[in-house]
Amino acid sequence: MKLAILSLFLVFQIGVESKKNGFALDHYGKPWECNLFNVFGPYCNNQCTENKARKGYCCTFTCYCFDLPDDAKILEIGDSRKNYCDVSLTDVLG
């Protein structure tokens, strides 16, 4: 019985870490912008992975990051833009 109570206690003490997608913000509270010169390069992926995301790419001229930690600050945007950017080009192309 003590083991069952201890197990339940431990289950509730262990936090669940989830990931989120979005436009990560820099230390000024602004998202990283991408342009015609770096839209296809590694710029956004580098910015996102430095921010502890799994990967990132340029979407609507702003760097969009996948699997950011819960504590990462992201730009609050409308659902339609987020849904559009949630489909990674690398996921679509393979």
Curated annotation (Swiss-Prot):
Disulfide-bond pairs as recorded: C34-C85, C44-C63, C48-C65, C59-C85
Tissue specificity field: Expressed by the venom gland.
Pfam families linked to this entry: Toxin_3
GO cellular component: extracellular region
Signal peptide: 1-18
Domain of life the protein comes from: Eukaryota
Major localization class: secreted
Subcellular location: Secreted
Cited Gene3D superfamilies: Knottin, scorpion toxin-like (3.30.30.10)
Record keywords, A-Z: Disulfide bond, Ion channel impairing toxin, Neurotoxin, Secreted, Signal, Toxin, Voltage-gated sodium channel impairing toxin
Database matches in InterPro entries: LCN-type_CS_alpha_beta_dom, Scorpion_toxin-like_sf, Scorpion_toxinL/defensin
Domain LCN-type CS-alpha/beta: 20-86
Keyword set includes Transmembrane: no
One Gene Ontology term of the molecular function aspect: sodium channel inhibitor activity
Comment block on domains: Has the structural arrangement of an alpha-helix connected to antiparallel beta-sheets by disulfide bonds (CS-alpha/beta).
Task of the protein: Binds voltage-independently at site-4 of sodium channels (Nav) and shift the voltage of activation toward more negative potentials thereby affecting sodium channel activation and promoting spontaneous and repetitive firing.
Family, similarity comment: Belongs to the long (4 C-C) scorpion toxin superfamily. Sodium channel inhibitor family. Beta subfamily.
Protein name in the entry: Neurotoxin LmNaTx45.2
Taxonomic source organism: Lychas mucronatus (Chinese swimming scorpion)
Lineage: Eukaryota, Metazoa, Ecdysozoa, Arthropoda, Chelicerata
